[in-house]
């Protein structure tokens, strides 16, 4: 290079981290891509590189501040000093998030310039530069983040290039040696890891995505890197449905009410601004009321529960049900939940049940807790009459769950590792979801349950284990199948892959027999043909679909980087066939003879031998399988408005969502009376009206899916000019949304503090009705209808929970009685995370959280 050449122009010493527009306006830039100011003013967000050239977010790797740790992905350390150069490659997946740079594949020196183009601002391999100069240290760290030094002499630049070329060659050699041993597993795993979550509010991501939806490049939005980036705080699955641009107006209205964006950005009409301010006040007031309601719900049981349960100390904490109440509730449990999840052996339970009422002090901890949990679970579907009675039942049942959790948490008692202890664990997890005691965080409790099951050898075929009787072998097979299904259900809700693979156990399916056909003295078990319905038929049908559902969860939340539509269609077709198989249980023939069981309980019928499947059992089985359909299609269903190819996914998701919240009516195959069939259907309705966990997830998935289908259909008709010509399908969707509004109202009255579901559904109806009246976004009438629907809903929900807070006073901890050990009958502890949630943002409606912590 000519030494007489004039020196290059001087560059800025400090890297220009703000975007060009913020520097021009002399305002603070949040350094996001795009930044909030550019989003608000609808201007292109452009960042200027150090060389003075202008690069947009689609073709430049931006330099950003990062952690001081040298092990951060994307940071290259220069040898011999503490200096470093760190670049953060831009994401080609839209504005959903950036991915950590993947390890480069092995290649020769001739392919090295492909790392960056010749005109790239950060191109360190410019062919016009000499690479033969000796290595010289010219890189200096920056207190605000890694940046290039101001030393730009030709010899220094050549030294930088030579040094980096040598280091790249060393890294490629190391990568080649690893790839030769592990194949392409390293590259595939690294490429699927997303960028660590930015330390900024979650609502900012949502508002930015929807405000810039019109400027997104064509193609699929919301890529896998974005899902991984947000997984650490988004504990539910249905938030991906919230990425649909059809919800942009509703989310913007909610953001303004929460004070996240300016009212002027939404509307300049004073009346609308006043309603927005009122809505924000109602949201805050409702949150405060919900916090007061939770004061009477301790998150941990008393220390005195370490004693034998029937002791007088425990009586201060647990309200033991009456014999008459316990008989009814336990019978309801065995007729409903025990069909799909075989946890208990009915004759054994009823024998222990009778012994307990004869001598309560002689009952073991496990038996006592089993009875309490069975009664609590059964009472969840009982007709209590009114909302106050439902709330009373919830307050009576939750202490039983706390008692079981405390007993299971003792790490020094080996009886927790017995079959009875595992049965208590399964019942406790089921009750937690039904009564919403940390039901949205049940995945974290499935790990200990699975590990305990592995420790006692439930994953091994009991026929190959020495000393295991036929009776115990059958109980172990049933319990293992139940635990596996609980694991896959919890994984679906937590956006997590299954905790184990299907090739890590060799347990055979349970036998198709009734409980009354085996006991401790049984030496030979002759199963019924699969065409005969027994008390195990529902679990066997559920178990047949387990490999498919495991595969769906692994496909959705595994480490692969992308989803292909043909694979989704294939899994969807197989899942539809599995649902058809489950529904065929209603056509199974009855047994040759009634296997009724007499357990000295008078007229109480406690048999588990059903002649045909009941409506509740059919609905529960269908629910546990069908709920996998919507998340499978969810990613593509959100794209159906812009890409008609994916309209099938929206249709399938809509059908599944409607089925989840619409229990099947009794059929002619059941032999019970019509009144009994109707009561069975009402049982499942009551479960959806009160339960949390996987049942609340189904409700949330249904409301987002059905609402999306309604908005997409209405907007399509508005564009095509058929909004007033073909209203039949739109009216049916509106009727479905109104049914969801009624269900959301029942949930609020029955103790749920999530008022945003009710508000969201009414806002959807208000938006569609405004479109039918000819209103369009920006004309004032559209915004007025949206805000009015939201405020009206918030007023109603505020009044409901306020009345509940006034009539159900919280516990006065200062007046609690203390026992001889100085411990209160129960301690307040921390609020359970299920009470308020992790984020007070709009996406908490679309995930598993319902309120934010104060």
UniProtKB/Swiss-Prot annotation:
Which is a Pfam family this sequence falls into? Fungal_trans
What SUPFAM superfamilies does the record tag this protein with? Zn2/Cys6 DNA-binding domain (SSF57701)
- Application in biotechnology: Xenovulene A is a natural product exhibiting little structural resemblance with classical benzodiazepines yet is able to displace high-affinity ligand binding to the benzodiazepine site of the gamma-aminobutyrate A (GABAA) receptor and could be potentially used as an anti-depressant with reduced addictive properties.
- Function of the protein: Transcription factor; part of the gene cluster that mediates the biosynthesis of xenovulene A, an unusual meroterpenoid that has potent inhibitory effects on the human gamma-aminobutyrate A (GABAA) benzodiazepine receptor.
Gene Ontology MF terms in the entry: DNA-binding transcription activator activity, RNA polymerase II-specific; RNA polymerase II cis-regulatory region sequence-specific DNA binding; zinc ion binding
Protein name per its UniProtKB record: Transcription factor asR3
Question: Compositional bias (Low complexity) spans?
Answer: 146-156
Residue ranges for the region (Disordered) are 56-156
Task: Tell me what gene encodes this.
Answer: asR3
- Highest taxon, organism lineage: Eukaryota
Q: Name one GO biological process term.
A: DNA-templated transcription
* Keywords carried by this UniProt record: DNA-binding, Metal-binding, Nucleus, Transcription, Transcription regulation, Zinc
UniProt-listed InterPro entries: Fungal_TF_Env_Response (IPR051430), Transcription_factor_dom_fun (IPR007219), Zn2-C6_fun-type_DNA-bd_sf (IPR036864), Zn2Cys6_DnaBD (IPR001138)
**Is Cytoplasm given among the entry's keywords?**
no
SMART domains in the record, alphabetically?
Answer: GAL4
According to the UniProt record, which residues make up the DNA-binding region? Answer: 19-45
